[in-house]
Swiss-Prot record:
Pfam families: NAD1. It comes from Rattus norvegicus. Zn(2+) binds at H92, C126, C133. Its cofactor is Zn(2+). This is Putative C->U-editing enzyme APOBEC-4. Residues 322-356 are annotated as: Disordered. The keyword Transmembrane helix does not apply. InterPro entries: APOBEC4, CMP_dCMP_dom. The lineage of its organism: Eukaryota, Metazoa, Chordata, Craniata, Vertebrata. One of its GO terms (molecular function) is metal ion binding. It is an enzyme of class 3 (hydrolase). The keyword Zinc applies. Its EC number is 3.5.4.-. Putative C to U editing enzyme whose physiological substrate is not yet known.
Length: 388
């Protein structure tokens, strides 16, 4: 494998040229280092706000930014980084990351521990002719079927009908989602925002991400994105309370206690719809978000459900001649025929015995009858002589 990229070590990570021929360009402020790893992947909060539209709803912009995480099968973080688009060559970050012989291809080829790729993008991936992001992602996953991909985005890119490529992008998203469970597509919302802020954004005061994570406008936009991606991919999203599922063990308990005291926390399902009349700065900490299935969860079977246990026995293998020998009697005749003949002989002997007994009984009865008749005749003769 001859890599297309060049990587340089820095004090807090690495910087990568996705294509070795890139050079400093006046048309692109990020050239030539569009991929950054480690702590080099952090961006200022102002840039994050303008790119991802957080904490307010998104608005049209041309910059593409993708954060990524590479994790092992147990969920341990192997590498984190970011990729930015190139305005000079009109290349999207997903196209750079999933390029054949590109940066991710080389990493996974040399490190078999990487099993999960998680992307956090401000735009959903597209498949337009100048970028082919989804096509490259699809081919990448075909080469690494043991690797899963989870894509989270803050807004859909060119899927509305007013864009000429909308139908093509929707069909490409549907095809990528068909690789489920290897691939999941979800809107960023709830606790995922908090995770991104803590991992990839710099210049945030302590406790801001937990106490003031959402606004009503951001909440409605996240729900709309989840609904739209569900309609496009026809894959039903699953929701959970992300603030609890994403809570880290070393999180400051006082910060979480402050968030739990908010009036909108732990609301009932009937109260999930936010009140638009409230202050836009009110944190919507009750937001339900798609659950990220990394690291994979192995659910044990229910103890109440019976399990079918199949035991395989090794039977004795006999040759055909031995099988025939076992089936025959010592006299060399088939067992079934010999038993049938013995049974018929016994029945004939029993019949002969019964016949002889019946004949003897018949003769005895006949002799008794004859004696009785003779006696009766003698009695009749005596009576007739007396009457004369």
């Amino acid at each position: 494998m001859e890599p297309l990229y060049e990587e340089y070590l820095t004090h807090s990570g690495t910087i990568v040229k996705p294509y070795y021929w890139l050079s400093v360009s006046l048309n692109c402020t990020n050239c030539p280092y569009h991929i950054r790893t480690g702590e080099e992947a952090r961006v200022p909060y102002t840039e994050f706000h303008q790119t991802f539209g957080f904490p307010w709803s998104t608005y049209p912009q041309t910059k593409h930014l993708t954060f990524y995480e590479l994790r092992s099968s147990s969920g341990n973080l192997i590498q984190k980084g970011l990729a930015s688009n190139c305005t000079g060559s009109h290349t999207h970050p997903e196209s750079m990351l999933f390029e054949r012989d590109g940066y991710l291809d080389s990493l996974i080829f040399h490190d078999s521990n990487i099993r999960h790729i998680i992307l956090y993008s401000n735009n959903s991936p597209c498949d337009e002719a100048n970028h082919c992001c989804i096509s490259k992602m699809y081919n990448f996953l075909m080469n690494y079927p043991e690797v899963t991909l989870s894509v989270f985005f803050s807004q859909l890119y060119h899927t509305e009908n007013q864009f000429p490529t909308s139908a093509w992008n929707r069909e490409a998203l549907r095809g990528l989602a068909s690789l489920w469970p290897q691939v999941t597509l979800s809107a960023i919302s709830g606790g995922i925002w908090q995770s991104i802020l803590e991992t990839f954004v710099s210049g945030i005061s302590e406790g801001l991400t937990a106490v003031r994570p959402f606004t009503a406008g951001r909440t409605l936009t996240d729900r709309y994105n989840a609904y739209e991606i569900n309609c496009i991919t026809e894959v039903k999203p699953y929701f959970t309370d992300a603030l609890h599922s994403w809570q880290k063990e070393n999180q400051d308990q006082k910060v979480w206690a402050a968030s739990e005291n908010q009036p909108l926390h732990n609301t009932t399902p009937a109260q999930w719809q936010p009140d638009m009349s409230q202050d836009c700065r009110t944190p919507a900490v009750f937001m339900l978000v798609p659950y990220r299935d990394l690291p994979p969860i192995h659910v044990n079977p229910s103890p109440q459900k019976p399990r079918t246990v199949v035991r395989h026995l090794n039977t004795l293998q006999l040759s055909a001649s031995k099988v025939k020998a076992l089936r025959k009697s010592p006299s060399g005749r088939p067992v079934k025929k010999e038993e049938a003949r013995k049974g018929s002989t016994r029945s004939q002997e029993a019949n002969e015995t019964n016949k002889s007994k019946w004949k003897k009984q018949t003769l005895f009865i006949k002799s008794n009858i004859c004696h009785l008749l003779e006696r009766e005749q003698k009695k009749i003769g005596i009576l007739s002589s007396w009457s004369v």
